[in-house]
């Protein structure tokens, strides 16, 4: 009996807390449908890795190292940045850049909405985090899970598990966070500004050249962003080339879903109680919220400044769609517009800003890598 149940004596209260956190993530995934393809495997993985002497992670037993499958997956897919890059192919294949190409000035707001990243970097440094850990935490503001994983892993951050949990949790909370912030920094009159939309035709040649040109420009400006932006744009090229419909469909659905599932399960190896239940995790939770809030504020404020000089006013709410949470943020902005005025349709404008934010967040991640590598 002791052989069967002796391991129970190795159980620590911190591990039980992690079981509760894992169960909470599973509940959020199923009941609230918050990023289920990632939070569900992450929650289950958190329980797996916090069982005493869990065979799911690498253990040293009687002087012999026994490799755990989750650690093997981590070394094979995250330590070498393979999973995030493959996921970028799927994301790129999902994105239609037509709203942005028909109104290129929207890219300004995608860039402005990255303000929270650099603001949070400064705050995290002041709070005592090492500059590379601060950069890894700040990139939560990209609202882009794969970029957060890529940057945090590149810098070998000690807080990878916490960063990923916080990043995806706040992405799922965009419909709650953004409306509150937007209402705080805009007036009723500004939120009611109507924007007409007349889609300008965009040639197939332009759609094909766009991912190539963006990759070249980003590579020249931020060389370390080439892997990130390159895989994202390659996915988009598969979508737009017109001769790889089957692969485009596979990348959008099968590849993206499978890699997201593996990411969630694999990242859980960094959610072991000893490294996760720390004061720093609570600080990362707060800093992640700061990053999201100031991303939103940055996009809105730049849109308001634009209105000072523009003949045709834009609704400043669309500036908030510049975060990379695609297409969730665009839908939030459109819903808010309709709540203020049931004839105020902002979806296509918001989508244009949202996809520009996808590009801007990846470039911002590359700039962080270039500056602090």
Predicted regions and their residues:
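Intrinsically disordered, low-complexity non-transmembrane regions of multi-pass membrane transporters
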Residues: 1-11, 16, 62-63, 67, ...
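Entry/N-cap segments of selected transmembrane alpha helices
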Residues: 97-121, 272-299, 350, 354
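Alpha-helical transmembrane segments
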Residues: 158-176, 287-293, 318
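Membrane-embedded hairpin module used as a gating/binding unit in multi-pass transport
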Residues: 166-243
């Amino acid at each position: 009996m002791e052989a069967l149940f002796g391991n129970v004596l190795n159980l620590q209260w911190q591990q039980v807390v992690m079981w509760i956190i894992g169960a909470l993530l599973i509940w959020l995934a199923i009941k609230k449908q918050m990023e289920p393809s990632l939070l569900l495997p992450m929650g289950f993985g958190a329980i797996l890795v916090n069982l005493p002497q869990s065979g799911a992670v690498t253990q040293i037993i009687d002087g012999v190292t026994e490799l755990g499958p989750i650690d093997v997956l981590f070394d094979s897919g995250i330590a070498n940045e393979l999973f995030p890059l493959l996921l970028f192919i799927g994301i790129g294949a999902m994105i239609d850049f037509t709203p942005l190409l028909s109104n290129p000035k929207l890219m300004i707001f995608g860039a402005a909405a990255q303000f929270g990243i650099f603001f949070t970097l400064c705050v995290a440094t002041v709070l005592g985090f090492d500059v590379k850990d601060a950069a890894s935490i700040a990139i939560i503001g990209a609202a882009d899970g794969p970029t957060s994983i890529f940057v945090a892993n590149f810098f070998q951050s000690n807080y990878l598990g916490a960063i990923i949990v916080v990043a995806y949790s706040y992405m799922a909370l965009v419909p709650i966070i953004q409306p509150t912030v937007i209402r705080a920094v805009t007036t009723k009159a500004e939120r009611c500004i109507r924007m007409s939309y007349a889609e300008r035709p965009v040639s197939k040649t332009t759609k094909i050249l766009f991912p190539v040109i963006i990759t070249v420009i980003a590579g020249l400006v931020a060389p370390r962003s080439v892997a990130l932006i390159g895989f994202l744009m390659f996915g988009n090229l598969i979508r737009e080339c017109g001769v790889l419909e089957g692969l485009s469909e596979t990348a959008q659905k099968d590849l993206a879903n499978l890699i997201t599932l593996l990411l969630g399960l694999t990242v859980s190896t960094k959610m072991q109680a000893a490294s996760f239940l720390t004061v720093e995790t609570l600080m990362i939770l707060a800093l992640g919220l700061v990053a999201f809030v100031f991303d939103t504020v940055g996009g809105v404020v730049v849109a308001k400044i634009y209105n000072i000089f523009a003949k045709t006013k834009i609704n400043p709410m669309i500036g908030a769609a510049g975060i990379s949470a695609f297409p969730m943020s665009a839908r939030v902005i459109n819903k808010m517009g309709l709540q203020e005025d049931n004839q105020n349709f902002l979806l296509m404008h918001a989508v244009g800003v949202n996809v520009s934010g996808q590009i801007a967040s990846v470039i911002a991640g590359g700039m962080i890598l270039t500056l602090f590598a």
